[in-house]
Design a protein with these regions (language model features):
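Mature extracytoplasmic/periplasmic domains
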Residues: 277-337
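A ligand-binding cleft/hinge motif common to bilobed small-molecule-binding domains
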Residues: 101-105, 233-257
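Short beta-strand->loop
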Residues: 112-121, 135-136, 163, 251-273, ...
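Periplasmic-binding protein-like
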Residues: 141, 204-208, 213-217, 254-283
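Early extracytoplasmic/lumenal segment of secretory-pathway proteins
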Residues: 40-105, 360
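Bacterial N-terminal signal peptides
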Residues: 25-36
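Extracytoplasmic ligand-binding site segments that recognize negatively charged/polar headgroups
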Residues: 48, 52, 74, 78, ...
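Extracellular/periplasmic bilobal clamshell ligand-binding domains
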Residues: 324-360
Length: 360
């Protein structure tokens, strides 16, 4: 699939052999049936996920089903433009990405088909699916507060909410990445959904005034800033701490991760903001049955166990436990149950609001 030259040669070979065998009707018929079956046994995935572990996931799917997985990787925005350009001729079956906002963008363009599977809709909560089941969550992540216990007291952190971070006592103490980051845009969109735009904008202005430094770096950079005393607290996705504690990013990041603790905000009211990894079947998919099989595979108990143990995300299935590293921080924390689809719907307002608040 992502080796178009090989694919084109295969297509030419198919035509040649069909012509060659034309005069042998029965053999030709059987050959064509076998060839078409083999040719159809694939699923083409466009993904913006950046996890090396996904390759072994695809290999396991092929081993279990016999369906070959072809992958095109890239940034979500670039893949969306590619899908639009390909139109009805697109070979893509699945769009697989992180952040509900990215799924919403594809949905808005009308590029998804509805997922018609009771096996999926019966196990994935409505707030973790597209409004009309255009896409579905495959894993969850929380956007939480990381803090330096030497700088932040237990009384300060105990019932801390996102809203509290706009208070004067946090001035010069907060690290977070830029407003161009989709994770932050979705966080602000969730606040708009819960609090309204006016209240959220006032919050954002005061929140920005409390930054310890100009927004910079990725999520792990924010955690490292707390470990290095450049900030007292940071906002980042939960799984990054798991990655760092696993030593997969080296001893330096392991030592940084050991210096911080993780806090789930808003446990006294609506719960912590969550986002998702998710996927949908594309409208022009040439292999819809295979695509559905892949989604059902991702949401099986065995694969959910595998995924969360590799990615350090949280499972969608309630009977699956997270990686032990993440479970050590708690498994029964309260989550905000607002529809994650609202992150995409409210994204334009969130981006404009962040700009008005001075969030760089």
């Amino acid at each position: 699939f992502n080796k178009f030259i090989v694919e084109n040669h295969s297509q030419l070979g198919k035509i040649f052999l069909m012509k060659l065998l034309y005069k042998i009707p029965l053999f030709s018929f059987l050959f064509i049936i076998a060839f078409e079956t083999l040719y159809a046994s694939e699923v083409n995935i466009y993904t913006s996920r950046h996890y090396d572990s996904d390759e072994s996931l695809y290999a396991e799917f092929t081993k279990e089903t016999g369906i070959k997985v072809n992958v095109i990787s890239g940034k979500g925005s670039a893949l969306l433009e590619r899908l639009k350009a390909e139109g009805k001729n697109s070979p893509a079956d699945i769009f697989f990405t992180v952040d509900a906002g990215n799924l919403w963008k594809v949905q808005k363009e009308g590029l998804f088909s509805r997922i018609n599977s009771k096996n999926i809709t019966s196990i994935v909560p409505k707030n973790l699916r597209g409004p009309n089941d255009e896409w579905v969550a495959t894993a969850k992540r929380a956007r939480v507060i990381f803090y330096n216990p030497k700088k932040v007291s237990e009384s300060e952190i105990k019932n801390l909410s996102y809203e509290d971070l706009a208070k004067p006592e946090w001035k010069g103490r907060i690290a977070i990445r830029s407003s161009s980051n989709m994770y932050n845009q979705s966080l602000v969109a969730s606040l708009i959904s819960n609090l309204g735009e006016k209240v959220t904008e006032e919050w954002a202005k005061n929140f920005v005034a409390n930054f310890a430094r100009k927004p910079q770096g990725n999520d792990r950079s924010q955690i490292i800033a707390v470990a290095n005393d450049e900030a007292d607290i940071a906002i980042a996705n939960s799984y990054y701490l798991g990655i760092m504690l696993s030593r997969s990013k080296g001893d330096e990041q392991l030592e940084a991760a050991k210096k911080v603790k993780m806090h789930f905000p808003n446990q006294q009211n609506r719960g912590s903001h969550i986002n998702i990894s998710g996927a949908g079947i594309l409208k022009n998919s040439p292999n819809k049955d295979n695509a559905l099989s892949f989604l059902e595979f991702l949401l099986s108990e065995r694969v959910q166990n595998y995924m969360v143990n590799i990615s350090f995300e949280y499972p969608v299935l309630k009977d699956v436990l997270p990686n032990p590293i993440m479970a050590a921080f708690g498994t029964d924390f309260k989550i905000d149950e607002v529809s994650v689809a609202s992150y995409g719907e409210l994204n334009p307002q969130a981006v404009k609001l962040m700009d008005r608040s001075g969030w760089q």
